[in-house]
Amino acid sequence: SDPNFLRF
């Protein structure tokens, strides 16, 4: 549920 984990 964290869009930050898609930031890679």
From Swiss-Prot:
Record keywords: Amidation, Neuropeptide, Secreted
Name of this chain's protein: FMRFamide-like neuropeptide PF1
Annotated organism of origin: Panagrellus redivivus
GO biological process, one term: neuropeptide signaling pathway
Sections of the chain in a coiled coil: none
Chain's role: Myoactive.
Family membership noted in the UniProt record: Belongs to the FARP (FMRFamide related peptide) family.
GO cellular component terms, semicolon-separated: extracellular region
Modified residues (Phenylalanine amide): F8
